[in-house]
Design a protein with these regions (language model features):
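Hydrophobic anchor at the beta1->P-loop junction of P-loop NTPases
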Residues: 7
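Phosphate-binding/switch loop-helix module in NTP-utilizing enzymes
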Residues: 76-105
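Short, hydrophobic beta-strand segments that form beta-sheet elements in well-ordered domains
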Residues: 98-100, 110-115, 129-137
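Conserved C-terminal guanine-recognition region of P-loop GTPase G domains, centered on the G4
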Residues: 105, 109-126
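The conserved Walker
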Residues: 11
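N-terminal phosphate/diphosphate-binding loop that engages ATP/GTP or pyrophosphate donors
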Residues: 21-83
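Conserved NTP phosphate-binding and transfer environment spanning the P-loop NTPase/kinase superfamily
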Residues: 129-172
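Conserved lysine of the Walker
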Residues: 15
């Protein structure tokens, strides 16, 4: 398995926007990147009248939709517990990097996206696994030593940090 980095922060902080920049920058260089995105909502991936939704409604445990352009697998959990992050990671095809949006308290290295204007506290003071913070405010006094502080408004600098982190970090 390649490297895994969580991208965490409160709703509205800009996690997905930053991830778009990071994935695009890495993919443009030919790097294979996977993404796992967690949602607390009941996600509807296709309209109920479409074939794959109808088959899931009929009782199929999993439905795989395949075309010359992409493959999608939808598994209905029904009464099963939500799989943990390790299980989800094991189901992905190999990649140099898997970025994980959400799973705030998972035991993986993380980049926090922190935007104080949304009115939520930073997570990094309570999570030693946060290795960097991308924010639109300067590094506060008292931020722990070794914590990278990145400019959220400069995605290229966050990408440069990610390149260095990938060279230095140990693959799990």
């Amino acid at each position: 398995m390649g490297k895994v980095l969580g991208v965490v922060g409160w709703s509205g902080s800009g996690k997905t926007t930053l991830l778009e920049h990071l994935v695009a920058g890495l993919a443009a260089r030919g790097m294979r990147v996977n993404v796992i995105k967690h949602s607390h909502h009941d996600v509807v991936l296709e309209p109920p009248h479409k074939d794959s939704a109808r088959l899931r409604s009929a009782g199929a445990a999993e439905v795989m939709l395949a075309s010359p352009y992409r493959i999608a697998v939808v598994r209905e959990l029904r009464a099963e517990p939500e799989p943990g992050l390790a299980e989800l990671l094991s189901q992905l095809s190999p990649a140099a990097l898997t970025l994980v949006e959400g799973y705030k308290w998972a035991a993986i290295p993380k980049l926090e996206v922190h935007r104080p204007s949304i009115g939520q506290p930073a997570v990094y003071p309570d999570d030693e696994l946060i290795v960097a913070v991308a924010s639109n405010v300067p590094r506060p006094e008292g931020a722990r030593a070794g914590l990278a502080w990145l400019d959220l408004d400069d995605p290229a600098s966050v990408l440069a940090w990610l390149d260095e982190w990938m060279k230095l970090s140990v693959t799990p």
